[in-house]
């Protein structure tokens, strides 16, 4: 059974463990962004292929969120890699990141002005398809939040109605866009143009076989974190199994981001769904803490202690807090596992760091198991309180009617 240990440590390395992994950025920003993009699209392809081969509809529905994010992130990374090929001055690079942020259309528009015409190996039809596709993604998901969280910072659900998404079309179009961008980057001149474009340049298409579709159910819209959390945590664990069994170590950072976002979502679920804050208060607290793991924990910690009636001699809260602080210090702003640099262009792994992949995966899952158990406990308590309040209201109404 997974459960936080007294001395759990994300950075612990068992020298006998397999696989062990060393990470160090090369110092070449353009190259690092390109390598990260390859790793992310590879992870997305492995996930989408797995869910298309399975008969488990819940996997299709839940894993959709993480794999779509991985695809989108791969495009953002390769777009920025191309831009940094032509933007070489540090301050200009910082300003570029600030201008485009996560907007794929903005990044592509700037690249279109930067890349000399002689370097563009795309045909006119391919350029038009790519621009339309990236624009469509940006119109749906401008700042890369739509498949990471169930609702915006203003508590508005991203999906207002039941939505069907064809996973095969999604994967095919994402790979088409990635290949076209790779050609612009001059990293893969050998790509054959013939039949490269298979479908219309739409981000989310619902046509095709039902067996190829993921469904975002209407019930997901009501501030429901569950499908997102399950999807991210299960996707992370699947990537871990591929690393362990097939030595696919390039999946490590995508795995870590799947887990990390799953933990952030689990903390926010407790804050929003269990702590009995009104929507505005919950929204303000999330806005203040942003992606801070420790900040979110500090908001809910006392509520958990009061509600759980933990024995005085229990060390669980202290054990969990150790995990929280370690993860927070490892990735304070939720960018270490998805970008090679921070917003000031400092490399995250400018010095060699060694990871025990099995231990890292274990620590993430031990922390998640605790947070998931807390949600179950608080949800049950809130249901009982709601029933008691309803019964008390009925008694008052009955007494009033007698008079």
Task: Describe the predicted segments one by one.
Residues 1-403:
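Domain-scale activation on soluble regions of proteins
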């Amino acid at each position: 059974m997974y459960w936080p240990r007294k001395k759990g440590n994300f950075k612990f390395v068992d020298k006998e463990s397999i696989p062990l992994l060393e990470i160090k950025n090369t110092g070449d920003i353009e190259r690092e962004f390109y390598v990260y993009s390859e790793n992310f699209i590879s992870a997305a392809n492995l996930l989408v292929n797995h869910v298309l081969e399975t008969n488990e509809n819940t996997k299709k529905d839940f894993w959709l969120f993480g794999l779509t994010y991985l695809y989108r992130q791969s495009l953002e990374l390769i777009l920025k890699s191309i831009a940094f090929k032509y933007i070489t001055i540090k301050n200009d690079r910082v300003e570029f990141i600030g201008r485009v942020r996560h907007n794929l259309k903005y990044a592509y528009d700037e690249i279109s002005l930067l890349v000399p015409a002689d370097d563009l190996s795309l045909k006119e039809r391919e350029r038009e398809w790519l621009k339309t596709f990236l624009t469509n993604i940006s119109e749906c998901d401008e700042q890369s939040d739509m498949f990471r969280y169930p609702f915006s910072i203003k508590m508005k659900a991203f999906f207002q109605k039941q939505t069907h998404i064809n996973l095969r079309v999604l994967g095919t179009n994402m790979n088409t866009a990635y290949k076209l961008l790779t050609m612009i980057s001059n990293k893969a001149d050998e790509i054959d143009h013939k039949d490269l474009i298979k479908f219309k340049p739409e981000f989310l298409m619902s046509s095709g076989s039902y067996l190829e579709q993921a469904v975002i159910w209407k019930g997901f819209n009501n501030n429901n974190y569950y499908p997102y959390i399950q999807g991210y945590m299960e996707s992370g664990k699947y990537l871990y199994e591929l690393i362990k069994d097939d030595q696919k170590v390039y999946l490590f950072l995508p795995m870590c981001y799947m887990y990390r976002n799953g933990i952030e979502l689990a903390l926010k679920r407790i804050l929003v769904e269990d702590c009995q804050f009104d929507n505005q208060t919950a929204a303000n607290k999330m806005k203040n803490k942003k992606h801070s793991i420790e900040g979110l924990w500090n908001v809910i910690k006392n509520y958990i202690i009061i509600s759980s009636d933990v024995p005085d001699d229990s060390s669980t809260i202290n054990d969990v807090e150790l995990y929280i602080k370690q993860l927070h210090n490892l990735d304070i702003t939720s960018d270490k596992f998805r970008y090679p640099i921070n917003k000031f262009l400092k490399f995250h792994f400018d010095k060699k760091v060694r990871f025990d992949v099995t231990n890292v995966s274990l620590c993430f899952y031990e922390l998640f198991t605790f947070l998931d158990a807390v949600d179950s406990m608080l949800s049950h308590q809130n249901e009982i309180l709601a029933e008691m309040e309803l019964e008390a209201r009925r008694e008052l109404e009955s007494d009033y009617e007698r008079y």
